[in-house]
Structure formats: structure tokens, C-alpha cells
Amino acid sequence: VIVTKSSDNSIKSFEDLKGRKSAQSATSNWGKDAKAAGAQILVVDGLAQSLELIKQGRAEATINDKLAVLDYFKQHPNAGLKIAYDRGDKIPTAFAFLQGEDALITKFNQALEALHQDGTLKQISIEWFGDDITQ
């Protein structure tokens, strides 16, 4: 996702980053995406510093993982920031099991599917991240 100040409506896509200041970790994939879009990169240590630079007006945007951004927004509801663009990237998540634990994996997957079907995962997602990240 691309994050900007809440009041900034000029960035609505990756193309809009061209020539703009984007606060990014130097070696992150998000930084590579910003550079590929033509953004001027302001090197930072991580997401919190990126968002601080945006709030201070020293950067105009940052690209980062939606889950990390939603977590920040949940902890800082009055940050004055918004998700300006969400390209809908899906980053697969997996749970680790020991090899040969097929019965456990089957039970786990069934339980996870039941929680998804009855809406429990959606409720947990909204409670902890303020958005439905189960889709």
C-alpha cells in the first residue's frame, strides 16, 4: 500500500510517486518498488520512521505492507495518515508443522476453514487491524 497524509489527495497510484519523496528502508522490496516508480528515496530504518517523516512533511509517501500499516493505524488512530492506494497484493501466510504431521495439519486446516466460514476470522481481523484482511 501507499501511505500519505490524510489531506494529500495527489497520490492515488504508483505512477503518482514519480519525482515525489518516498521514505523507504534502503534494501526493502518496498523501496525497490518506490524507486521503480520514479520516487526520490529518503532512506529510513523502518515503517515508524517513514510515517514520522510523512507527518513532518519531509516525505510525501511510503510503500509498505498493508498489515503493518493497519497495525500502526490501530495503535495511532489520530496519526493524520491514510492508505492512498492499495494495489491488492496478496502475501501468502503459512503455518509451520513438522513433516509427517498430516493428521494435525488436516485438523488445523479444518478448524481454520470453520473459523473463516462462521466469520470469526473476519471479526478477529477487524478487532486487531481495523479492516478485514481475510480476503
Each language-model region and where it sits:
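Periplasmic-binding protein-like
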Residues: 1-4, 66, 70-113, 131-135
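Flexible hinge/capping segments at coil-to-helix
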Residues: 4-22
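Ligand-binding clefts/hinges and TM-proximal coupling segments of bilobed small-molecule sensing domains
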Residues: 29-42, 81-84, 107-135
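Beta->alpha turn/N-cap motifs
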Residues: 5, 25-29, 46-47, 63-73, ...
